[in-house]
Design a protein with these regions (language model features):
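Binuclear metal-dependent hydrolase catalytic cores
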Residues: 1-84, 90, 173-204
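Cap/insert and terminal regions of metallo-dependent hydrolase folds
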Residues: 73, 79-84, 90-193
Length: 204
């Protein structure tokens, strides 16, 4: 609730300007408010339903992004199709359980070998604060090897990598840092996500 209220407050003026500029017919005011859905994630590896409407079911399960607490992933079900969002996390048994046979698994990915190399360079150059951050972030994200193994064991039909670290600066880096190492472990359809990407899953 706190986060949603913060976003609403931050965008309140922006929304009023858009409505004033385009008119209520184009920008209906009732579309503006975001309503938080409060829930307590299960303490174990189970999932709970947090949304159910018009055939869409959204479930949530606990993941591990300590010290961020709670941290969750999501399983979205519609017309027999399943999309799973890993959330920010290391690999957990709950992820495996709720990603099984997903039509699409969207999972964060970090190439810790490359991040570690960047950390070392920063330390050698005397950038201790930056080096410390690069060291710290490795303990609460999934390495590319974890992601590939998870998707393969879960039998996910498609895997889309997101929240990439380090951010690739070219298609070659995207392949070298992410696609290639994940593909060594995952045999399904693999996508390296980018802003604006749309993935269509046909339903019956």
């Amino acid at each position: 609730t706190q986060i949603v209220e913060g976003f609403r407050s931050a965008y309140e003026l922006e929304e009023s300007y858009r409505i004033a500029h385009h008119g209520e017919e184009i920008m209906p005011p009732e579309w503006s408010p975001s309503e938080p859905i409060e829930f307590v994630p299960p303490a174990d590896d189970s999932a709970i339903v947090i949304y159910e409407k018009d055939g869409v079911t959204v479930k949530t399960f606990r993941v591990n992004h300590a010290p961020v607490e709670p941290s969750v992933g999501y399983r979205i079900e519609y017309a027999g199709k399943v999309v799973v969002l890993s959330g920010d996390t290391i690999r957990t048994t709950s992820q495996l359980e709720h990603s099984r046979n997903a039509d699409l698994l969207v999972a964060e990915a970090m190439n810790k070998e490359v991040v570690g190399a960047i950390e070392d360079i920063n330390r050698e150059l005397g950038y201790e604060d930056q080096a410390t951050i690069l060291f710290d972030i490795q303990d609460y994200h999934m390495d590319v090897s974890d992601v590939g193994a998870l998707a393969e064991e879960a039998n996910a039909k498609q895997l889309a990598l997101n929240h990439l670290a380090p951010k690739p600066q070219s298609g070659r880096q995207a392949n070298l840092f992410f696609r290639d190492p994940v593909a060594e472990l995952y045999s399904g359809q693999l996508l390296v996500g980018k802003d604006g990407m749309q993935i269509v899953i046909p339903v019956p």
